């Protein structure tokens, strides 16, 4: 928080929501509800590396949908994937499945039933919303890596240094 402050030095706006204990992503969003407002927002996991063109999501119109997910082909550490994708809609069918890339546009309504301060994951909310046809998605097949472990981060770092 000290390093980035409110983001004004870099031309962005950062608002911090304090968690006394980790609340998972949906719980954290519910905790920050007053900071986020009522408009859809971009959610990006801190432990991914990619060359996805984020500007394509600026002003993304969810319409009546609750989320738009970016999915990727399943990486070796997650071969079963998370969701299906058919006709631009995310689903829960057994196959073919893709992995959530850690990039989404989310309506705050997705977490409307989550109490501020409570621990809650996004995946169950997305599965329920996808079952109602309320989640769209896209498949991204560019450069993407989950760097959520020291080993995966080191492997990517080594690969990026190669000529």
What are these regions (language model features)?
Residues 38, 64-65:
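Short, high-confidence coil segments that cap the C-terminus of an alpha-helix
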Residues 1-45, 116-117, 162:
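Conserved N-terminal catalytic core of the sugar/cofactor nucleotidyltransferase
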Residues 5-6, 80-87:
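Acidic-glycine-rich active-site phosphate/pyrophosphate-binding loop
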Residues 32, 45-47, 84, 107:
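Residue-level signal for inorganic ion chemistry
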Residues 68-82:
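Short beta-strand-to-loop element that shapes/binds the nucleotide-sugar donor at the catalytic cleft/hinge
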Residues 41-42, 49, 53-62, 74-77, ...:
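Catalytic-core segments of class I nucleotidyltransferases/pyrophosphorylases
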Residues 18, 45, 52, 69-71:
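Short loop/edge segments at beta-strand edges and connector loops
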Residues 13-15, 66, 134-136:
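Conserved beta-strand segments of alpha/beta enzyme cores
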């Amino acid at each position: 928080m000290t390093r980035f402050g409110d983001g004004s030095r870099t031309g962005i706006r950062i608002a911090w929501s304090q968690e006394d204990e980790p609340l998972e992503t949906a719980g954290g969003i519910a905790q920050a509800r007053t900071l986020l407002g009522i408009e859809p927002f971009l959610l990006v996991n801190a432990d991914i590396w990619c060359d996805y063109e984020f500007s394509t999501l600026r002003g993304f119109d969810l319409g009546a949908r609750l989320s738009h997910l970016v999915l990727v082909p399943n990486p070796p550490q997650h071969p079963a994937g998370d969701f299906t994708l058919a006709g631009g809609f995310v689903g829960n069918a057994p196959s073919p499945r893709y992995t959530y890339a850690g990039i989404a546009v989310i309506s705050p309504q997705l977490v409307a039933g989550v109490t501020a301060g409570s621990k809650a994951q996004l995946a169950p909310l997305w599965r329920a919303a996808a079952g109602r046809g309320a989640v769209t998605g896209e498949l991204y097949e560019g450069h993407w890596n989950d760097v959520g472990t020291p080993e995966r981060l080191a492997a990517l770092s080594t690969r990026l240094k190669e000529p």
